[in-house]
Structures are given as structure tokens and as C-alpha cells.
Amino acid sequence: MKYSSLLIAALGLLASRPAAACSRPPAAVSRPAAIAAAQDTTAEKMLAFQRSNGGWPKAVNEVKVDYRHPMSAADLAAARRDAGALDATIDNNATTREITYLVTAFRNTQNPAYKQAAENGIRYLLKMQQPSGGFPQYFPDTRFYRAQITYNDNAMTKALTVLKAVADKKGDFALVDAALVPQSQKAVDKGVQCILKTQYVQHGKLTAWCAQHDRVTLLPCKARAFELPSLSGDESVAIVEFLLTLDQPSPEVRRAVAAAVAWFQTSKIENMAVADITDPQEPKGRDRVMVAQPGSTLWARFYDLDTNQPIYVGRDGVKHARLADIENERRTGYVYAGTWPEKLLIKDYPKWQQKWPAP
């Protein structure tokens, strides 16, 4: 299909402006019918890709969707024919991105189709939430690790952020069906309880979270071969940042935040940095290495559940203590170390702590 050549929009699409109805005479703009018919070209593409269950795919036929790409009427019609596909997901910003864009498009155009699509997207998020309060990566697709509680790439925290905006009637989300407000608040409350229950206890001490947790046992679990049960120095940041947004945080939430921040502090890799270098001996002529750099601080993407030591895992699923010990393809194609918690530790947590000291 022609539309299958599309790629996922960068987060910047949220800043794109809706197309004006330039062909209409100025006098017609004030008429209610003309306002209702106003269109946003990006929103129209989102409507075409929305699945009948309310969610959106991140890709079609393994090719990612790009709402910036022009689509003809035939392309839009072809996209609509896949409405019954069961590939809706919250991975890679799918669904949460569209909902957020569409509520703003509705405010700007007053096109009721955008409001309805956003509301159906919100209902999709409510439907996909599991009894534990967790959110799977895909719904209703349960193959592989897709049904597990997914913090990976901040999928669950983004879903909860949208639902919290609905519950709080924040900004343009105040325009959606009022019946969704209490439902969204209930979902947020359940999600917070899931976050608290999945925070890993290591030798009697609360620490952080895995990128995926088993939907039944709530324990850390495996995803891809190189994503073993472990503690995440990346996704755990977004979880804590979400908890910081809660009004009147309970003592349990405050303890969880304090424990996670303490874990980030003790899990630092100090005086090291990551560097991308040219290396003619490698297959693609490049490599990614960890180098000594006084004053720099890193955190690993994965930490061993027992020892809390950084682990680096390639496609063979074997743990290694050094980035250099895994294959070049993974070293250069995946991010195993970064500075993710830096802003949380330096700015966000200290500011929050002034208002909400640890219990």
C-alpha cells in the first residue's frame, strides 16, 4: 500500500499547526457549519490510522507511520481499510501522541471528529489497563512480552500522564467528555498502586524498577534477548518524575520517591563518559565506547537484580560487566549507559522535596 511508506512522526509533530481552511471566503469562517468542517491535515491522517478499538499502531507492515508525509485521498482510504487490525500500542509514543494532538486540534478547529477520536483513544487506554493497574505494551495483542507491564520507553508513564491530564481537566483535555474524568482518575490511582507494588526490593531495600514486570507476579521479567530482568537506570527516571506530579502524595509515594532517588545516587558510574568513535576495524567503521572523563557521571541502562552492578547484554542474552564485551552491533545500536537521572537529581527532586519531605 502507498501509505505503508510512512514513518513515525517525531515528538515535534505536536508543535505543528493545523492547516487553515484557506479556500473559504472570510465571511464563511464565522458560520458554525464552516467551523465544524474545519480540518487539520495531521489530525485527518491520525483519524485514518486509528483502529476500531480506539488505539493507534506505531507501524504498518513493519514500516513506521509519519504524519508529516503528504497523503492523498487514496492513501487515507487505504489506511482506513486497516481499522480492524489488532496492532494498537502505546510503544514509541503511539496512541498517547495522537490523543494529545487531537484534543488540541479540536480546540483549534472545533471539528467534532477530532474530539470523538481523542475520546475513543482515551477509552482505549482505560480498556487496556490490567487488573494490577499496569499497562501492557500492546492491546489486545498478547504475543511475546507485549502483555507484560511495560515501563520500557516510558510507555506506561506516558499513558498515565494522559489519563492524569484528563482527570485534572488540564488544558485542552478539559474539552473531552466529562464522563471520562472519574474513570481516568480511577485508572491513575490504580496505576500508582502498580508502580508502588512493582518497585523492586533488593536485599530488604526499595530500589527502582525493571523495564518490564510480569503482569501476574509483578516481578521484573525479560523482554528481548538483551533486555534481561534487571533494574533500569533509564525508565525508572520517568516513573519517579510521574510520581512527582501527584497532588498530595501519600506517605507510600514519598517513600518510593526517596528510595528511588537514593538508589540513583548509589548506582552512579563516576568519572566515565560514553563516546562514539571512528573505528575502521568495525563492520560499519564506528564504535561506541566508555572512556574515563573526570567529573562525568553515567548510569547503566541495566543493573543486576542481586549485585546491583551494571550489566551489558548482547543478542546472545549473556551478562557482561563491560560494554566492550558485547557485539559491536548492539554497542552502536542500543543505549546501554546515559545521564538520564541527572535533571531529576539536580533540579526536580530537590524542588519537590522542599514541599514533600520524606516521611
Predicted regions and their residues:
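Bacterial N-terminal signal peptides that target proteins for export
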Residues: 1-7
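Terminal, non-catalytic domain-edge segments
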Residues: 20-42, 165-190, 216-223, 227, ...
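Solvent-exposed loop and edge beta-strand segments that line ligand/cofactor-binding
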Residues: 22, 28-35, 79-94, 143-156, ...
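N-terminal carbohydrate-binding/catalytic regions of secreted carbohydrate-active enzymes
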Residues: 40-96, 101
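Long, well-ordered core segments of solenoidal/helical folds
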Residues: 41-54, 117-134, 185-204, 256-273
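Intrinsic, low-complexity N-terminal interaction/targeting segments
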Residues: 56-57, 61-62, 69-82, 131-142, ...
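Eukaryote-skewed repeat-based solenoidal scaffolds used as protein-protein interaction platforms
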Residues: 115, 119-122, 126, 143-199, ...
